[in-house]
Every structure is written in structure tokens, then in C-alpha cells.
């Protein structure tokens, strides 16, 4: 699947200092030490392409983009994989509602997402695969789990054959990533795609591994499991393994994926006898009109609509930078006005052309400290006002080109 064209990367020499990132699993901020020396490997969960990119999506992929920029600045090569969930219930339901082929809907919305990412100057992943493209690999993994005795059937009245579930019992307690109690899990499992009360399941949190073919739905042949389509969680395991290998360094995504998706993706990998991710970094939720911004609620602010109405994409990035990536925050129309004023002041400051190594170092220090964009903006505001957040400039040989640093570290170009 075509992703998008990456922006030209500004030529800022690497600092060589490590990124320190909050790991959801441990609850601590620790340095990212690659499992493969010299190369950091990241996986970010992709969209289900049945609607346009909203600011909640943008916040997630902005955070992942900052991670790879920070890792690049630390002197590492970076390999990233990202999926597109183009075979899933919400997409199939939307296609049926609108009377279009599910493949056409997925293709059109994936193309729009790519346009939005390109406008926001997000670096494209090295591996970008849809579920439908990766179906052969997914089926191979599902059959491998069956061969290991980890899959069991549950009768489905509306299908010709049974659905298949992953038996989690052999691996002990669920929740290695989230650390949640069973009560916390049950509170959200059903609304996030689970079916804890389905008759015939061995465990309430056992995830759907292979859904039997239903009338009007796409289906593929999975040998002894019959025709059908994969469950959600196994898909990311397969695309990650194919793209960057298992285990990898950082799993990224929105905080609404901590449970069940990331807990259960890790459980699938463990069931295969392979570790999954070394660390987990999750971005907060963006709210609007008092609720989490989501397709199901319809309270969405779309990136492409803002851009088409004349909003500079760099203003959108500055809106996202104004909130720490792990924070939940509420969108208001005033966010754009404040960010537009910031961008204007930065462009005026860039025309001065003064050399400020301390500002560049302040930007780097903020980014490598758990992607602290709020602190970075404080340094940029001081620079724009003609001052410095870090004292006098004493080393004229140090990198001091603030616009280049903004581009390389934060993806912000001051070219108008």
C-alpha cells in the first residue's frame, strides 16, 4: 500500500543523547535502548479507514513522528511499521450503509489519510501494510496458533462454521501492558470490540482469532479453520513481525488501545512463543464538546477540512505541540488562533537570523525528555521575543540555527 512522501529532513547533526520515554507497562520514564544496536524499531497502530483523519488521529501520529525524530537526533537509524485496518466491522458497516464496496471506501479514506500526513510533514513509515495485503501472513500465524493448541472453536448461529478464539489460560493473567484489574477490563472490553459474555468461550477475555464467513462479508480460506477473516489483535502482530521483526523497541498508539488491543496483541505474540514490544508509549485522548473525539460519536474536527479552509498545517502541528503527548485535552476553536499567532512570531524571529545555540539545546533537551513539547514551545517563545531560555550564547561553533532545529526535531517549517 502506498503511504505518502516524507518531508525532506533538515540537516541537523545528531546530538548523540538518548530519548527518555514513558513506558506504560512500567510506569517509568527510561532511556530507549535499542534491542538491535544502532537501530530503533517502532510500531504504531494505524487507522480503520472508514472516515477522514480527525485531530485525535493527528495527535497519535504526531507523537509517533516526534519519537522517530528524537531517536534520529540521538544518532540512531529508525525503522517504523504501521498497519491499515481495512478489514473490520466499522468499515464494513459504513460501506454497507453508503452502498459502496468496502475496498473502495478503504482506498479512498486511506488516500485522504496519506494526504493529511503529508500536509502535516509526518515522516512516512518504512513498512505500511493493510490487513488485506498481509492476509497470507496473518492466516499463517492463525494456523500456527491452532497447531500449538491455542485456538478453539465457538459455534456461530449466523455462519456456516464456527468462530475461533485464542485460549489465554496457558499464559496466566492478562494485563502485562495495562496492569489493569479484571474489573477495570470488564468495564471497557465490550465497548472496545470484546465479547466477554459470549456463550461457549473458555475465558471472558479470550479474543476472537478467526471470524467465520458471514453473508455479504469478505472472507479468505484458512484451511482447517474454514473461510473467514481475522480478529483485530492478531493483525498487528503479523504486520509488525513482517515489517520490523519481533520483539521490537516501542509500540505506540492512543491510550484507548492500552486495553484490550495492546494487552491482547502482546498475548498473541506470547502464545506464539515470541516477545512483542520492549516498551509502550501512549498518547492521550483529544476531546471535543465534552467527549473523546471519536468516529462513533461524530464529534470530529477533521484535518483535511481545516487545511481546505485555509489553516496552515504548521498551525495544526503547533496546536498539537501545545499539549504534552500523554495528556488528555479538549479542542477549542481558540487553539488555532493561539497557534497561528505563535507561527507568525516564529517566522518574524527567523528573519533576524541570529545564532542561538542555547535555544537549540533547549529544544533538544525538551524533546528527549519524554517528548516535552510544552517546554519546547516555552523555549521558542523566548527566542521569538528576542531572549533565550537557557542563558547567554557562549559557543558560536555549536548548532544555533533555530529554524533548522525546529524542522529536524519537530517537523515545523517556517517557510510560508
From Swiss-Prot:
Motif ('KMSKS' region): 292-296
Lineage top rank: taxon: Bacteria
Any GO molecular function: zinc ion binding
Tagged with keyword Oxidoreductase: no
Alphabetical list of InterPro entries matching this protein: Cys-tRNA/MSH_ligase, Mycothiol_ligase_MshC, Rossmann-like_a/b/a_fold, tRNA-synt_1_cat_dom
Lineage, highest ranks first: Bacteria, Bacillati, Actinomycetota, Actinomycetes, Micrococcales
Physiological role: Catalyzes the ATP-dependent condensation of GlcN-Ins and L-cysteine to form L-Cys-GlcN-Ins.
EC number: 6.3.1.13
An annotated GO BP: cysteinyl-tRNA aminoacylation
GO cellular component: cytosol
Keywords: ATP-binding, Ligase, Metal-binding, Nucleotide-binding, Zinc
Cofactor requirement: Zn(2+)
Protein name (record): L-cysteine:1D-myo-inositol 2-amino-2-deoxy-alpha-D-glucopyranoside ligase
Family membership: Belongs to the class-I aminoacyl-tRNA synthetase family. MshC subfamily.
Annotated organism of origin: Brachybacterium faecium (strain ATCC 43885 / DSM 4810 / JCM 11609 / LMG 19847 / NBRC 14762 / NCIMB 9860 / 6-10)
Motif ('ERGGDP' region): 191-196
Reaction catalyzed: 1D-myo-inositol 2-amino-2-deoxy-alpha-D-glucopyranoside + L-cysteine + ATP = 1D-myo-inositol 2-(L-cysteinylamino)-2-deoxy-alpha-D-glucopyranoside + AMP + diphosphate + H(+)
Positions bound to L-cysteinyl-5'-AMP: 45-48, 60, 83-85, 232, 254-256, 286
Subunit structure: Monomer.
Motif ('HIGH' region): 47-57
Translocase keyword on record: no
Cofactor binding mode and count: Binds 1 zinc ion per subunit.
Residues bound to Zn(2+): 45, 236, 261
Amino acid at each position: 500500500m502506498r503511504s505518502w512522501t516524507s518531508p525532506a529532513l533538515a540537516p541537523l547533526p545528531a546530538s548523540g543523547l538518548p530519548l527518555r520515554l514513558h513506558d506504560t507497562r512500567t510506569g517509568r520514564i527510561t532511556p530507549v535502548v535499542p534491542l538491535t544496536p544502532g537501530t530503533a524499531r517502532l510500531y504504531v497502530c494505524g487507522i480503520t479507514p472508514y472516515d477522514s483523519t480527525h485531530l485525535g488521529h493527528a495527535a497519535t501520529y504526531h507523537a509517533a513522528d516526534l519519537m522517530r525524530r528524537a531517536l534520529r537526533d540521538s544518532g540512531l537509524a529508525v525503522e517504523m511499521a504501521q498497519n491499515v485496518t481495512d478489514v473490520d466491522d466499522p468499515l464494513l458497516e459504513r460501506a454497507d450503509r453508503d452502498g459502496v464496496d468496502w475496498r473502495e471506501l478503504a482506498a479512498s479514506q486511506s488516500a485522504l489519510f496519506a494526504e493529511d500526513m503529508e500536509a502535516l510533514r509526518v515522516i512516512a513509515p518504512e513498512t505500511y501494510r493493510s490487513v488485506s495485503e498481509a492476509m497470507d501472513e496473518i492466516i499463517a500465524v492463525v494456523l500456527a496458533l491452532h497447531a500449538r493448541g491455542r485456538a478453539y472453536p465457538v459455534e456461530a448461529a449466523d455462519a456456516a462454521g464456527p468462530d475461533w478464539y485464542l485460549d489465554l489460560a496457558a499464559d496466566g493473567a492478562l494485563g502485562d501492558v495495562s496492569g489493569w484489574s479484571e474489573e477495570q477490563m470488564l468495564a471497557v472490553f465490550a465497548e472496545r470490540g470484546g465479547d466477554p459474555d459470549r456463550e461457549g468461550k473458555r475465558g471472558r477475555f479470550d479474543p476472537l482469532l478467526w471470524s467465520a464467513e458471514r453473508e455479504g462479508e469478505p472472507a479468505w480460506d484458512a484451511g482447517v479453520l474454514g473461510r473467514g477473516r481475522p480478529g483485530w489483535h492478531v493483525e498487528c502482530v503479523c504486520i509488525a513481525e513482517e515489517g520490523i521483526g519481533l520483539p521490537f523497541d516501542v509500540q505506540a498508539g492512543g491510550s484507548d488501545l492500552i486495553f484490550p488491543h495492546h494487552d491482547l496483541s502482546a498475548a498473541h505474540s506470547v502464545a506464539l512463543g515470541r516477545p512483542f514490544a520492549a516498551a509502550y508509549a501512549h498518547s492521550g485522548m483529544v476531546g471535543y464538546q465534552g467527549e473523546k473525539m471519536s468516529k462513533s460519536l461524530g464529534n470530529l474536527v477533521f484535518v483535511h477540512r481545516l487545511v481546505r479552509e485555509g489553516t496552515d498545517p504548521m498551525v495544526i502541528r503547533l496546536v498539537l505541540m501545545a499539549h504534552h503527548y500523554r495528556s488528555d485535552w479538549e479542542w477549542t476553536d481558540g487553539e488555532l488562533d493561539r497557534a497561528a499567532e505563535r507561527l507568525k512570531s516564529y517566522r518574524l524571529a527567523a528573519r533576524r537570523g541570529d545564532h542561538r545555540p542555547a535555544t537549540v539545546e533547549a529544544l533538544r533537551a525538551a524533546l528527549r525528555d519524554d517528548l516535552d513539547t510544552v517546554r519546547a514551545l516555552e523555549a521558542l517563545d523566548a527566542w521569538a521575543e528576542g531572549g533565550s531560555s537557557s542563558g547567554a550564547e557562549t559557543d558560536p561553533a555549536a548548532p544555533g540555527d533555530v529554524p533548522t532545529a525546529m524542522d529536524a526535531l519537530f517537523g515545523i517549517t517556517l517557510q510560508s
